[in-house]
Amino acid sequence: MAKRSLSNLSAADLRSKRVLVRVDFNVPLNENGAITDDTRIRAALPTINDLIDKGARVILSAHFGRPKGQINEGMRLTPVAKRLSELLGKNVTKTESCVGSDAEAKVNAMADGDVVLLENVRFFSEEEKNDANFAQKLAALADAYVNDAFGAAHRAHASTEGVTKFLNPSVAGHLMEKELQYLQGAIDDPKRPLAAIVGGSKVSSKIGVLEALIDKCDKVLIGGGMIFTFYKARGLSVGKSLVEEDKLELAKELEAKAKAKGVQLLLPTDVVLADDFAPAANSQTVSIDAIPDGWMGLDIGPDSINLFQDALADCQTVIWNGPMGVFEFDKFAAGTNAIATTLADLSGKGCCTIIGGGDSVAAVEKAGLAEKMSHISTGGGASLELLEGKVLPGVAALDDA
């Protein structure tokens, strides 16, 4: 179901209106409390600037970390307000609490185009419980609602779902709209051939996604630590590589399902092994049927890279979720980097390349190729759930188009 978005609202609709905007500002900090990556803050700028330009009074709501429903001084949004103020080139007022007299006073003092950042909503346990009274208090600060926090859209919380019952209009922000357009579009109406590259260490965390993708894709390429569960299910020796013993039957079923549907399910043909889980471990590259005892696979090998590149060459849409190996160790990053480079090249030839959140995003950024991709998702769990075909509560709650 298509949703109304900020694009549908004019300056006349928004001028002098108090607009509550749920954003995803859950950014990483270093030990000194400085932001180490402001990507999520920058991702919300198009929505915030659009509202400022249309004369709205912008009230931002966000969570930070997991304070478990109580005030945690290390999880205040102070560094976020400072960085946002620098990026916008204007003052951002932060409240002491997300509801209550201080928030009300600061919101009441706003002029058109002003920006207020409410303190961490998760300082209240009612946020994650989606408590109606708490949602009503948040909503009482505003006249309209915009959800731009795709990364939190899979949660039915007070600030993502509850507030929509009290605010009309409730619409998607520009980032949310773009996420839905790309991710939903790739699943519902992709340019074909459609390929998915699924990596990461565990089959268990990607079961739903793998099952859904085998239903939708023409090709599914699997890398990362989860490949060893598939190999063991085939009866191969995997040394001391990571295996989920309770998922061996499932691995067999997934391979059988792909075969029955005529979907090309590709696993690596060679792997880079290490004698220890360490950056400077001894390494060797072997065929998957020649993994010796005492060694563990930490990356896909050069033959597998060629196999995957050939399979992707004619694809018109590619979704990538999860690295091919332990890319944090330079010695075992070749597979992941090769996929990143391949997708960047495909983008240049008109292929729609979607990096579906999580570690793949970090890998693409580490390789300096983020700008070359069609779309980089800001959601981890939300991206996975959308690709699985699940309804995201934060999206479902918005006004229908």
UniProtKB/Swiss-Prot annotation:
<dbReference type="InterPro" id="IPR001576">
    <property type="entry name" value="Phosphoglycerate_kinase"/>
</dbReference>
<dbReference type="InterPro" id="IPR036043">
    <property type="entry name" value="Phosphoglycerate_kinase_sf"/>
</dbReference>
<dbReference type="InterPro" id="IPR015824">
    <property type="entry name" value="Phosphoglycerate_kinase_N"/>
</dbReference>
<dbReference type="GO" id="GO:0004618">
    <property type="term" value="F:phosphoglycerate kinase activity"/>
</dbReference>
<dbReference type="Pfam" id="PF00162">
    <property type="entry name" value="PGK"/>
</dbReference>
<feature type="binding site">
    <location>
        <position position="297"/>
    </location>
    <ligand>
        <name>ATP</name>
    </ligand>
</feature>
<feature type="binding site">
    <location>
        <position position="155"/>
    </location>
    <ligand>
        <name>substrate</name>
    </ligand>
</feature>
<keyword id="KW-0324">Glycolysis</keyword>
<protein>
    <recommendedName>
        <fullName>Phosphoglycerate kinase</fullName>
        <ecNumber>2.7.2.3</ecNumber>
    </recommendedName>
</protein>
<keyword id="KW-0418">Kinase</keyword>
<comment type="subunit">
    <text>Monomer.</text>
</comment>
<comment type="similarity">
    <text>Belongs to the phosphoglycerate kinase family.</text>
</comment>
<feature type="binding site">
    <location>
        <position position="40"/>
    </location>
    <ligand>
        <name>substrate</name>
    </ligand>
</feature>
<feature type="binding site">
    <location>
        <begin position="24"/>
        <end position="26"/>
    </location>
    <ligand>
        <name>substrate</name>
    </ligand>
</feature>
<dbReference type="GO" id="GO:0005524">
    <property type="term" value="F:ATP binding"/>
</dbReference>
<keyword id="KW-0963">Cytoplasm</keyword>
<dbReference type="GO" id="GO:0005829">
    <property type="term" value="C:cytosol"/>
</dbReference>
<feature type="binding site">
    <location>
        <position position="328"/>
    </location>
    <ligand>
        <name>ATP</name>
    </ligand>
</feature>
<feature type="binding site">
    <location>
        <begin position="63"/>
        <end position="66"/>
    </location>
    <ligand>
        <name>substrate</name>
    </ligand>
</feature>
<keyword id="KW-0547">Nucleotide-binding</keyword>
<dbReference type="InterPro" id="IPR015911">
    <property type="entry name" value="Phosphoglycerate_kinase_CS"/>
</dbReference>
<feature type="binding site">
    <location>
        <position position="122"/>
    </location>
    <ligand>
        <name>substrate</name>
    </ligand>
</feature>
<feature type="binding site">
    <location>
        <position position="206"/>
    </location>
    <ligand>
        <name>ATP</name>
    </ligand>
</feature>
<dbReference type="GO" id="GO:0006096">
    <property type="term" value="P:glycolytic process"/>
</dbReference>
<keyword id="KW-0067">ATP-binding</keyword>
<dbReference type="GO" id="GO:0043531">
    <property type="term" value="F:ADP binding"/>
</dbReference>
<dbReference type="GO" id="GO:0006094">
    <property type="term" value="P:gluconeogenesis"/>
</dbReference>
<feature type="binding site">
    <location>
        <begin position="357"/>
        <end position="360"/>
    </location>
    <ligand>
        <name>ATP</name>
    </ligand>
</feature>
<keyword id="KW-0808">Transferase</keyword>
<comment type="pathway">
    <text>Carbohydrate degradation; glycolysis; pyruvate from D-glyceraldehyde 3-phosphate: step 2/5.</text>
</comment>
